[in-house]
């Protein structure tokens, strides 16, 4: 009885302390957001780089903050900050896409991008999660990346390091982004044959979505929760039964950098949620692995058909995925060195 009382007392003492930590965190991020909002331009510069580096370093450590439960003022700040981050990311990727395009073979110099290693880690994590949660499926042969941008590193890394026989269809609403992205693969005979770039609003893409085994939804496609929900519902209507959906989200204080996606929205969109993984290292985005339920097989005589429901269990973050990802990386780096150097 005494132990229980002491535990309750300690919990009450820790709660105000935790609230104070969150309050200070939000206060610091608010100050950084104000400073970023005053910048005359979000194009790469020492001042821009310094502010965003400080912001990222502030948001990366594990935090118990639930950004969805913040007050109205903090929510408004968060919404503005995510839009600023999206604009800055677009400027950064366009800048480095131009830098890389100046080389005879741009893919030999991808490590010039300051966050290239993050993309390597994210791609290996997503690949390992797909392999773990869809183990019976054959390797995907056609993939789509929605919101690929001017520097489609996710597609490039997955194509060269993990799926060397697959084709990748990259969708972006901006024609200039696709023009920049396509320049990067022209000198590589293999990747140029496996990479396609489509200028389109994904909300208008319908029948083509049924051709893909896996669809990746970039974190910044549909920044508002309602917009993201409509996008997922659209994908649920038009993707092929049995196809996988990989959604990038955010968790904790990282939700100040990217939109947070509720797994329930994925379910409501017509998918089984197979896993939700929240990395704790340099990789900022959380990853949600989902699948559109396959068409039920015809009932056997004297028995019932087995069909997927919508109550899939969401796996908690685990170290096994990270271990698998590291193992995949070690095995594949040797064969990928010639295809996609990282230095």
UniProtKB/Swiss-Prot annotation:
Pfam families on file: NAS (PF03059)
Please give the organism: Oryza sativa subsp. indica
Please give the tissue specificity annotation from the record for this chain.
Answer: Expressed in leaves.
The UniProt GO MF terms for this protein read:
nicotianamine synthase activity
Name under which the protein is recorded: Nicotianamine synthase 3
The EC number(s) this enzyme carries: 2.5.1.43
The question of whether NAD is a record keyword is answered with: no
User: Can you tell which superkingdom this protein's organism belongs to?
Assistant: Eukaryota
User: What is any one GO biological process for this UniProt entry?
Assistant: nicotianamine biosynthetic process
Q: Which UniProt keywords apply?
A: S-adenosyl-L-methionine, Transferase
Reactions that this protein is recorded to catalyse? 3 S-adenosyl-L-methionine = nicotianamine + 3 S-methyl-5'-thioadenosine + 3 H(+)
Q: What is the main EC category here?
A: transferase
Concerning InterPro entries, the annotation shows: Nicotian_synth, SAM-dependent_MTases_sf
Q: Which family does it belong to?
A: Belongs to the nicotianamine synthase (NAS)-like family.
């Amino acid at each position: 009885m005494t132990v229980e009382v002491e535990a309750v007392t300690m919990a009450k003492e820790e709660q105000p302390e935790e609230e104070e930590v969150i309050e200070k965190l939000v206060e610091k991020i608010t100050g950084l957001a104000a400073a970023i909002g005053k910048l005359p331009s979000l194009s790469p510069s020492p001042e821009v780089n310094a502010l965003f580096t400080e912001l990222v370093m502030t948001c990366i450590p594990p935090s118990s903050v639930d950004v969805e439960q913040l007050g109205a003022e903090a929510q408004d700040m968060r919404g503005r900050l995510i839009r600023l981050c999206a604009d800055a990311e677009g400027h950064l990727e366009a800048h480095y896409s131009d830098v890389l395009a100046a080389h005879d073979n741009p893919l030999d110099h991808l490590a010039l991008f300051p966050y290239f290693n993050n993309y390597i880690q994210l791609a290996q994590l997503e690949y390992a999660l797909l392999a773990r949660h869809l183990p019976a499926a054959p390797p995907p042969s056609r993939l789509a990346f929605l919101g690929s941008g001017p520097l489609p590193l996710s597609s490039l890394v997955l194509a060269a390091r993990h799926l060397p026989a697959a084709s990748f269809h990259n969708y972006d609403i901006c024609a200039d982004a696709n023009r920049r992205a396509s320049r990067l693969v022209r000198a590589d005979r293999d990747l140029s044959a496996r990479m396609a770039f489509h200028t389109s609003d994904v909300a208008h893409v319908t029948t083509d979505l049924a051709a893909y085994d896996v669809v990746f939804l970039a974190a910044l496609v549909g920044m508002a929760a309602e917009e993201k929900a409509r996008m997922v519902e659209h994908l649920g209507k038009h993707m092929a039964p049995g196809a996988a959906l990989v959604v990038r989200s955010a968790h904790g204080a990282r939700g100040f950098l990217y939109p947070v996606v509720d797994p329930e929205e994925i379910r409501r969109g017509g998918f089984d949620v197979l896993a939700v993984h929240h990395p704790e290292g340099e990789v900022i985005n959380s990853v949600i692995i989902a699948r559109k339920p396959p068409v039920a097989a015809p009932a056997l005589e004297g028995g019932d058909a087995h069909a997927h429901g919508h109550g899939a269990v969401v796996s908690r973050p685990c170290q096994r995925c990270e271990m698998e990802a590291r193992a995949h990386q070690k095995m594949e780096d040797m064969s990928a060195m010639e295809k996609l150097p990282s230095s």
